[in-house]
Amino acid sequence: MNASNPCRRFPRSARVRTRAQYTVVFDTARRTSDPLLSLHWRSGETPPRLGMAVSRKVDTRAVGRNRIKRVLRDAMRHLLPELAGGDYVIVARSAAAKATNPQIRDAFVRLLRRAGALPLPAAPGTMPPARAPRPSSLSPTEPDPRSD
């Protein structure tokens, strides 16, 4: 669980749960892939929901499959406030079984950004956007004392 709030769980309202919901996403959604994960998403006005498919082809041991799901749920829980609405279904690939937790999390964030569900991070070293000019204390009829 989360270290700052250990009781906080991934809410049921933020999950794709039924076979019908998965079918709708797979039939009508767009898809983008990474070597570790594949993301199927369907934009919408609804709050963001996550579904996961981690088959026995990925890892024959339940412990390995559950680790992948746990990492994805935790990443989603932290990203939920800034995530665009819609349904997101993650399909794990066999390479995810050998990946570390940070690698899985980074692949998930990368796919969400590629899908446009998360804002792109600002490039390092870039200047912030220019602010609107403040109104001058001088009126337009008074000459500027600095111009002399």
From Swiss-Prot:
PANTHER family: RIBONUCLEASE P PROTEIN COMPONENT. It is an enzyme of class 3 (hydrolase). NCBIfam families: rnpA. One of its GO terms (biological process) is tRNA 3'-end processing. The keyword Hydrolase applies. RNaseP catalyzes the removal of the 5'-leader sequence from pre-tRNA to produce the mature 5'-terminus. It can also cleave other RNA substrates such as 4.5S RNA. The protein component plays an auxiliary but essential role in vivo by binding to the 5'-leader sequence and broadening the substrate specificity of the ribozyme. Residues 119-148 are annotated as: Disordered. The keyword Magnesium does not apply. It comes from the Bacteria. Keywords: Endonuclease, Hydrolase, Nuclease, RNA-binding, tRNA processing. The gene is rnpA. Belongs to the RnpA family. Its EC number is 3.1.26.5. Consists of a catalytic RNA component (M1 or rnpB) and a protein subunit. GO terms for cellular component: ribonuclease P complex. This is Ribonuclease P protein component. Pfam families: Ribonuclease_P (PF00825). GO terms for molecular function: 3'-tRNA processing endoribonuclease activity; ribonuclease P activity; tRNA binding. It catalyses: Endonucleolytic cleavage of RNA, removing 5'-extranucleotides from tRNA precursor. Signal peptide: none annotated.
